Amino acid sequence: MKYPPSLVSLIRELSRLPGIGPKSAQRLAFHLFEQPREDIERLASALLEAKRDLHVCPICFNITDAEKCDVCADPSRDQRTICVVEEPGDVIALERSGEYRGLYHVLHGVLSPMNGVGPDKLHIKPLLPRVGQGMEVILATGTTVEGDATALYLQRLLEPLGAAISRIAYGVPVGGSLEYTDEVTLGRALTGRQTVSKPQPPQRPGDEDGADGAAVPASR
């Protein structure tokens, strides 16, 4: 028996979502089919509204519906500390911990040469002008192979800019994502972060070359 074309199309589109395979997409499609029409219309409206109103913050690249995100627009935040994360969901997770009052920078991914993701595919270059002498940059990428490789690449790139660089570590499970780590563990991870590079005299003239020329650690 063949599925109707409209159902096949729905399953195909749902399977494009992260973490959703063909079988999960099929279950979701049947679930949606069984829901009242008004529920489906409300879901469709919410999707269209989010796509219309949401964009990335021009400073930190977090998701926002305003000119700047709430963190960048808050003058009470610590302007001398920047926490670098992989995805917008990581910002929400760290904010829930209540242990961090600095700024953020969202990369929207990690380095993954095997998947064709190099530095030019991430929001790395816009980070460089935000970092200066006497600041601290917390590298809070995940503890996956790609997350560690991205942190090492950023460390090498940021060291000449004169900032102290630390790596989130304590309590975050190996191979884990910050988005799925509980707030207590994340709070301890921030408090127990380890310095990986002390401040050095800034070398601003090499910014452009560094962004393109620093070696990308190979992911295993």
UniProtKB/Swiss-Prot annotation:
Described purpose of this protein according to its UniProt entry: May play a role in DNA repair. It seems to be involved in an RecBC-independent recombinational process of DNA repair. It may act with RecF and RecO.
Gene giving rise to this polypeptide: recR
Name of the protein: Recombination protein RecR
Residue numbers spanned by region Disordered: 190-220
CDD domains named in the record: TOPRIM_recR
Membership in a protein family: Belongs to the RecR family.
Record domain Toprim: where: 80-173
PANTHER family the UniProt entry points to: RECOMBINATION PROTEIN RECR
UniProt-listed GO biological process terms: double-strand break repair; recombinational repair
Zinc finger (C4-type) residue numbers: 57-72
Keywords per UniProt: DNA damage, DNA recombination, DNA repair, Metal-binding, Zinc, Zinc-finger
Claim: Glycoprotein is one of the keywords in the record: no
HAMAP family, alphabetized: RecR (MF_00017)
Top-level taxonomic group: Bacteria
Listed GO MF terms: DNA binding; zinc ion binding
Alphabetized PROSITE patterns for the sequence: RECR (PS01300), TOPRIM (PS50880)
Name of one Pfam family that matches: RecR_ZnF
